[in-house]
UniProtKB/Swiss-Prot annotation:
This is Serine hydroxymethyltransferase. It is an enzyme of class 2 (transferase). The gene is glyA. Its cofactor is pyridoxal 5'-phosphate. Belongs to the SHMT family. GO terms for biological process: glycine biosynthetic process from serine; tetrahydrofolate interconversion.
Length: 434
């Protein structure tokens, strides 16, 4: 083809029509294998879920081609009239879901949403209060390796040793002592409800902003089955996956117009450039799904299933931190059995039950070893598991853990093989994307 001539039409036809399996069989194979893993394994990672085919379609749409720096009606690029529709729908649906006045749907993750709040409300070196990571907090709430722990001065509150519930007396004492600019409620491993009204009272007493990170339980809030951060919080952030069952991403919510402007500026141009419009469209689809009556039924089942799973594991002789759960997750404390989270995660994985090792309050083990595992019910509930199935899952987990307790970290191969067979029989009854 000579210089200056049009691209060969055969090449163009292939570019626009060839499927992934034709153009990149290695990636196509990896995706196919991951679909098989999701179909045949029981997913109990509390931060994971399974999205609808409609969400997949939106995220894989031509909106991936469009740059749209700025906000709807105020873009720095032309040709944004249709992606504006998608973002405006996402914003409107988010506000309806959570009963708030303002929503920023552009954060690429929950971590970036949290960073945006920090940028808007604090200066480097300012003090904030958050739940200790070891007690169920989150990396972005002041862990030393995270930017939140490097740029700011985190002060951590924890849970009471006797019942593993938030120590509100300690929260109040630390707030009075350190006078933080921001107080955070929320975390990644706390299975109980939060006293948002009391947190706001404490924040007001020291002139602090009250910030709720509801990444894990936002879907339960949207369904009206978990206390809402509003009207207590000055700001709330969330991921859009987990219990909200959307694409991976983040969001900032508030009722304060002045703060909303600060959050918008913090996200763009403060932290991000062009937003991911295909992901924002997928967020809008998921929010639309969450506004339907069926989502409330789903969210209630998530909670019922979590309680059934926790009760079954307790009946099997294992401890659950705080004695149970109010939401979608639980921490299994393995200390009295002499087990580690690392060994438990590996053994369950061999039986095709997926979870993650997790620290428990006052854990003597290193974060890479841990004394517990975290379990969650959103993904398996999405595929149709009910209370009966989760009781069976709990029994299977106990069998695998007992095998480690009896035979060491290598586990009981015969038990794990038998459990794996039962896992496949169960997952075959509940296909995904069939």
């Amino acid at each position: 083809m000579s210089a200056g001539t049009a691209t060969d039409t055969t090449d163009l036809d292939s570019f626009f029509s060839a499927h992934l399996a034709e153009t990149d069989p290695e990636i196509a194979k990896a995706i196919s294998q991951e679909l098989g893993r999701q179909q045949h394994e029981i997913e109990l990672i509390a931060s994971e879920n399974i999205v609808s085919r409609a969400v997949l379609e939106a995220q894989g749409s031509v909106l991936t081609n469009k740059y749209a720096e700025g906000y709807p009606g105020r873009r720095y690029y032309g040709g944004c009239q249709f992606v504006d529709i998608a973002e405006e729908l996402a914003i409107d649906r988010a506000k309806r879901l959570f009963g708030c006045g303002f929503a920023n749907v552009q954060p690429n993750s929950g971590s970036q949403a949290n960073q945006g709040v920090f940028m808007a409300l604090m200066q480097p070196g300012d003090t904030f209060l958050g739940l200790d990571l070891a007690a169920g907090g989150h990396l972005t709430h002041g862990a030393p390796p995270n930017v939140s722990g490097k740029w700011f001065k985190p002060v951590s509150y924890t849970v009471r040793r006797e019942d593993q519930r938030i120590d509100m007396e300690q929260v109040e004492r630390l707030a009075q002592e350190h006078k933080p600019k921001v107080i955070i409620a929320g975390g990644s491993g706390y299975p109980r409800h939060w006293d948002f009204a009391k947190f706001r009272e404490i924040a007001d007493s020291v002139g602090a902003y009250f910030f709720v990170d509801m990444a894990h339980f936002a879907g339960l809030v949207a369904a009206g089955l978990h206390p809402s951060p509003f009207p207590h919080a000055h700001v709330a952030t969330t991921t859009t996956h987990k219990t909200l069952r959307g694409p991976r991403g983040g969001m900032i919510l508030t009722n304060d117009e002045a703060l909303a402007k600060k959050f918008n500026s913090a996200i763009f141009p403060g932290l991000q450039g062009g937003p991911l419009m295909h992901v924002i469209a997928a967020k809008a689809v998921a929010f639309g799904e969450a506004l339907k009556p069926e989502f409330k039924i789903y969210a209630k089942q998530v909670i019922d299933n979590a309680r059934a799973l926790a009760d079954t594991i307790i009946s099997g002789g294992y401890d659950i931190t705080s004695g149970g759960t109010d939401n979608h997750l639980m921490l299994v404390d393995l200390q009295k059995k002499g087990l580690t989270g690392k060994a438990a995660e590996a053994a369950l994985s061999r039986a095709d039950i997926t979870c993650n090792k997790n620290g428990v309050p006052f854990d003597p083990q290193k974060p890479t070893i841990t004394s517990g595992i975290r379990l969650g019910t959103p993904a398996s509930t999405t595929r149709g598991f009910g209370v009966a199935e989760f009781k069976q899952v709990g029994s299977l987990i106990v069998q695998v853990l007992d095998g480690i307790a009896e035979k060491g970290d290598g586990g009981d191969a015969a038990v794990e093989a038998a459990v794996k067979e039962k896992v496949h029989a169960l997952t075959d009854r509940f296909p995904i994307y069939a």
